Amino acid sequence: MTVLHSVDFFPSGNASVAIEPRLPQADFPEHHHDFYEIVIVEHGTGIHVFNGQPYTITGGMVCFVRDHDRHLYEHTDNLCLTNVLYRSPDRFQFLAGLNQLLPQEQDGQYPSHWRVNHSVLQQVRQLVAQMEQQEGENDLPSTASREILFMQLLLLLRKSSLQENLENSASRLNLLLAWLEDHFADEVNWDAVADQFSLSLRTLHRQLKQQTGLTPQRYLNRLRLMKARHLLRHSEASVTDIAYRCGFSDSNHFSTLFRREFNWSPRDIRQGRDGFLQ
């Protein structure tokens, strides 16, 4: 597995924060690094496989990666990221207690993926731009300024995470997308889902298409197919069983959609013919 080292990304040995844009981010194999990062999804779509679990990522998603996490990007489509790298929560010169603002693992579950709305994403970009402007400065005031900006970034993300922000339709759409990640195998009635998240059906269709480039049903089908591909690679369940577990009532229809999406049949994936290394 590829290991990325801080010496290749941080501007100096005492720099606590570094900005690494990926515009765009191409497919990238599984890797980990000796630093932490906050991945800000600017726009586009892709699959982020995080510690073996696939997540569909779109604009407005924020991913918190620790130094022992492993992850990869695949099936990217105009995916643009800004990575905010930091050495460790306890490696800041002027800040302490940052860990309290970061996602916390509970009962083996780590909430690594958050969503923020468009207006918050704009504020995030402004903070990141200010940090970038100061990257070449190594004096104490500049270091302190960068760390203060990093603290402001964490506070903004914390306050604006979907759990705390349901004031507008964009935030409710983000909550809906997170709900789909957990309920992709359920039979989805879009009228009922729109009501559940206080959205009109027309607004749901329009905003989901704007954010993901896909219609709601197309997005759901892709999400189900991604989950199915993961199970084909990492479980012993039959193709038929996986189809049912991922929300498809007809395994033949599942196989047709699967081949159309990935250009490989479910059996090809199961046998590793796509070249994926497990």
Curated annotation (Swiss-Prot):
| Lineage of the organism | Bacteria, Pseudomonadati, Pseudomonadota, Gammaproteobacteria, Enterobacterales
Record's function text? Activates expression of the rhaBAD and rhaT operons.
Source domain of life is Bacteria
The residues annotated as site (Interaction with sigma-70) are 241, 250
Q: InterPro entries, per this entry?
A: AraC-bd, AraC_XylS_family_regulators, Homeodomain-like_sf, HTH-like, HTH_AraC, HTH_AraC-typ_CS, RhaR_RhaS-like_N, RmlC-like_jellyroll
Q: Which GO terms describe its cellular component?
A: cytoplasm
Could you identify this protein by its name? HTH-type transcriptional activator RhaS
Source organism per entry reads Escherichia coli O81 (strain ED1a)
DNA-binding residue intervals = 191-212, 239-262
Q: Which UniProt keywords apply?
A: Activator, Cytoplasm, DNA-binding, Repeat, Rhamnose metabolism, Transcription, Transcription regulation
Fill in the subunit field for this protein.
Binds DNA as a dimer.
CDD domains, alphabetically?
A: cupin_RhaR_RhaS-like_N
